[in-house]
Amino acid sequence: AKHVVTMIPGEGTGPEICEAVRMVIDASGVDIKWEYEDIGLDCLEKYGTLLPDKTIQSIAKNKVSLKGPTTTPIGTGHKSANVTLRKVFDLYANVRPVRLIPALKRPWDKLDIINFRENTEDSYAAIEHMVSDEVAQCLKVITWPGSYRIADFALKWARDNGRKKVYCVHKANIMKMTDGLFLEAFRAAAKKYPDIETGDIIVDNCSMQLVRNPGQFDCLVLPNLYGDILTDLCAGLMGGLGFAPGANVGDNCAIFEAVHGSAPKYAGMKKVNPSAVLISGVMMLRWLGEKEAADRIEKAMYQVLDEGKRVTYDVGGTAKTDEYAQAIIEKMHAGVK
């Protein structure tokens, strides 16, 4: 096979979503061999860990993975498998694009933003402690190398994908050292990309501007915490997490996955919308250089959504997960306009 991809179906509705996505990607004619591996709560019973070694080895070997949603056990002392994956492979860039999907009838004229969220530091580095019974403290750690590499990654992605504008989101007016450093590193990285328009925007103003007029933004680079919050806000602008794709990327590998959870209450019902994982799969195809197949899948998906006949319940239809996938495949075979 031309490409070998580690497929992690995940939990809850994950396996049925990933099966639908695999059908669509295979139907596009791309030569992919899928290597199936497990992750999550099922593995805890089988292997005594949420993230088995053989899954890690498969991703390390193939350097690319498509992953379904997993369930993070709350309050069990087990770290989320997602967080562990990010640490093991140093997946420092969380890439979350949002685009206007006409069928979702959102009020914006234009929405086409790629968010680049720093994935390894900031106040999410899990350095928290109780100072006394009544005082809790959290350390916000920002480093120059961590900040520079996410900025450079975003600027390079922008250049490679024909994007024009990259803005850094921060709160350096108040957090002069930490966010100040993040902004400084961004400006230093930007010097290598004179062809790209760069600037910065304060996070609270950015939130307001996103809701008022999201069409003004192109690419945003964000520290971890603001990135977590604003990427979900952007998913809302787009019409919800059912269509929000994502990728976690490092220097040696990339894991593509939806942002949404595993919705265990719907497991096995073939009810949920696989679009977020499908669009993540489309991102993966572009990453692998299979641009033509990626475009075909995307156009077919938009057409099926526009027609609104064979779509899932969350967008007003009655189609099952696999029926929606089948409709997309038929559109592709009919020759997408």
Indicate residue ranges for each PLM-predicted region:
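Glycine-rich phosphate/diphosphate-binding loop of Rossmann-like nucleotide-binding domains
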Residues: 6-27, 132-204, 216
